[in-house]
Amino acid sequence: SSSRCKRCLSSSAASAAATVKGFMTLREDSGIAGVLVNRVSGAHHYELVRDAVAHYTGLPCVGYIEKHVNLALKSRHLGLVPAEEVEDALPRIQEAARQVADTLDLPMILELARRAPVLPVAPRKYPRMDGFRMGLARDKAFSFYYRANLDALEGAGVELVPFSPLEDGELPKGLDGLYLGGGFPEVFKVRLSANISMRQSIRTALESGMPCYAECGGMMYLSESIDSAEMVGFLPQVCRMTDRLQRFGYVLVADLKTGRTYPAHEFHHAATEATGEAAYDFEIRKASRPELCWPGGMHKGNTTAGFAHLHFLSHPEWMERLWR
């Protein structure tokens, strides 16, 4: 109606409609089918935005979330505090769900989702690693894993065997390899250092030739120390924490020993320094600015370690090369 149109024009809701319109027209294939309005003051505010969006874009709104609904999560230097450390995570999710149940049009959201076209998915080709038992460091100190990487390993026939460098006294029996992912070892460095038997168990396994891939926090744990806290001591380097980001963004990792290059992502406040005559085995380049490069990462024995997070499906052969 004309009165509703005037209300759209005269209210700040028009700016919300402009934002939606901008996303719709920026790309012809945007595929935007509906709008969920966030941080509104109440039902009347939502109605203003809903009418403006409908008037200027023709899109339906599927409900709203009021700004008083507490969906905030605590954060630290690398982003959100992991779910493993949020003791009331489930009750908070349930309370948030209760609060938005009356303001979201769930049937409409599901209907719009059902109309979405099927996205093309490239066939996944995994190297076969049937029967390979891989120890997976997983606790509050080590929780940064791409779910797709774990799925890829299991798709290749790997049995993932979780263990805790914080709580367990030694590695699980009968392992063929180790995967030490990222996380917050610097937050738990005192406890990690105090678990001497686990540190010795890991070092003994690696010195005996067990294949291992250590990524970011996992690499830090294998170093001689994090700040003043003694770590596994397998890699000839020391780590220190800084008060600012050292690296952040997409990178290209060139393995100087094999000549292969892999896309990856770095995000860390830590800095490392090789000890003795040790040298780094990778050349890292900023993906958006290839002229920026720096050394990083090490091979030692059958262990490969570095700050970069890799997605195994970008180079499936990487999995087999790491642990065979």
Where do the model's predicted regions map?
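Inter-motif core of Ras-like GTPase G domains
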Residues: 1-11
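Beta-strand-turn-beta hairpins that frame and shape the catalytic cleft
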Residues: 129-132, 258-262, 299-304
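Pocket-forming structural segment of enzyme catalytic cores
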Residues: 224-292
